[in-house]
């Protein structure tokens, strides 16, 4: 989708999320102590239903078992795509998934609306039809020389409207206004008419 695909001009790029970082609907999400700039990313996740390797792009849709919503909680502290990117994406409760897995063959994987609210205010409003590289391209790219297993998930990337999108920065990367970033007590909802609503409250880390 728009934001992540700015990184994908030469083809799909990806990073791994640790399964131990997962959270689900209703879970409190811990504000990472390593940053003061916590962001949200509304995404759609496809759930793999078959063990595959080196799958062709045109053969990927039958591999999909179902769909769920995701919030790719992110740290925005002068992070670039590289080793530090992994650090910014993996922390306890840092991958929101839910509220359930929808199994429905009538769903078009390239026409799933997804949006996000913070404290009731709509911040993101997108659709998987905005993906520059479709699910088949991602599946073919990821499964080349790497086996995908049932239960694995691939996330779509996020539409425009994240906090990091919202405000201009100084040449040194300092934000002129950080008010769009999340704070403890904020309630964040990822929503889709096809997949439900994933709701989490941000809390201070223990």
Please give the residue ranges for each predicted region:
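Catalytic-pocket segment enriched in acidic/His residues
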Residues: 6, 76-206
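Active-site microenvironments in enzyme catalytic cores
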Residues: 1-122, 203-205
């Amino acid at each position: 989708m728009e934001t992540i695909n700015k990184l994908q001009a030469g083809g799909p790029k990806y990073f791994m999320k640790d399964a131990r970082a997962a959270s689900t609907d209703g879970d409190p999400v811990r504000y990472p102590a390593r940053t003061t700039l916590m962001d949200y990313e509304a995404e759609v996740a496809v759930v793999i239903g078959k063990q595959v390797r080196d799958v062709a792009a045109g053969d990927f849709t039958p591999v999909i078992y179902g769909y769920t919503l995701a919030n790719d909680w992110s740290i925005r502290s002068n992070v670039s795509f590289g080793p530090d990117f992994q650090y910014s994406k993996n922390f306890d409760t840092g991958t929101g998934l839910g509220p359930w897995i929808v199994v429905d063959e009538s769903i078009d994987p390239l026409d799933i609306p997804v949006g996000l609210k913070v404290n009731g205010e709509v911040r993101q409003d997108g659709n998987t039809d905005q993906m520059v590289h479709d699910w088949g391209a991602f599946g073919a790219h990821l499964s080349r020389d790497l086996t995908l297993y049932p239960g694995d998930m691939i996330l779509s990337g996020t539409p425009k409207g994240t906090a990091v999108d919202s405000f201009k920065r100084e040449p040194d990367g300092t934000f002129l206004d950080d008010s769009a970033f999340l704070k403890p007590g904020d309630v964040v909802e990822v929503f889709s008419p096809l997949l439900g609503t994933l709701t989490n409250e941000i809390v201070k880390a223990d």
